[in-house]
Amino acid sequence: YKKGDIGELMQAECEYLHDCSSIWPSITYGERNHWRNNMSSVFYCTHSIGPVLFATGLRPVRVSGFETRNMDFMRKLGDPAGSAGTLILTLENGAIVKSIDMNLRRHGNNYILYGDRGVMETDRFNAKMLHIRQEREKNCTGDWVSYTPLFTDERASGAGHGGGDYFTTNYFIDRLLGNDDVKPYTIDVYQAVDMCIPGILGYRSILNKNVGIDIPNLRNKAERDAFRNDTFCTFPESAGEMYVSNDLSGKEEIPDEIFAEVERRWHAGEPG
């Protein structure tokens, strides 16, 4: 993207679909107030929108949030939130991004970026493969090129999240050690917030009939100050008086027996 092969971003779609139902006992331990049982449907958005923002260098300026209803297969495991969420972002150049996350019935990390001179996308069934199409001088002409990118550091090949766990940590440590060469590959605190705050404000949008919410640029002190005491979230220990529930189902509270059963499965090594 930074070479300009597909031009300026117009629209992107990104998915981090991870049906966690089978592993829910081993990652929540039957704890009612485990953060995964308290998060909203759109909270876990960095894995989907992060690569788009990092590749393009663009900042999100507005978000609308949507969620599915809370499905029984997750509620029976102690999760009361909407079982999947969607964010629609507007970026600073006017581009639109659609992000889909969480417990849909497949496991996939998929990205497609449409530029004004071409398109690039990951393969839906072979996550290691990339497809790129560049426009020629005449409109609607061009060829597809498909290839499998190689790791720049083979030590990443065994790391989680497609090598991302290795690279983000490695570059972060290198930067702390004073290696300026890795600066283009590191994520600073403002970029990190840009990748996660759409999920927080996206849930505010969901609670307000999916209305668009402006995303602050926290690099600017005036915009930071406007949000300094805003603790709105679904985590009671952090939100204080601004706490909102992640359960919009209208159903009765999940009984203690559910969490006891999930804890039993965890200790027994049984799936969800």
Q: Each predicted region: which residue ranges?
A:
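Predominantly a Rossmann-like dinucleotide-binding segment in NAD(P)-dependent oxidoreductases
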Residues: 1-79
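Glycine-rich beta-alpha junction loops
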Residues: 14-20, 67-72, 93-95, 103-105, ...
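C-terminal glycine/acidic-rich active-site capping loop/insertion
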Residues: 32, 54, 62, 72, ...
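Glycine-rich phosphate/pyrophosphate-binding beta-alpha loops
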Residues: 46, 95-109, 161
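A general structural signal for well-ordered alpha-helical segments in protein cores
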Residues: 48-49, 169-170, 199
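Active-site beta-strand termini and strand-to-loop segments that position acidic
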Residues: 80-82, 87-94, 113-115
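Short arginine-rich
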Residues: 198-208
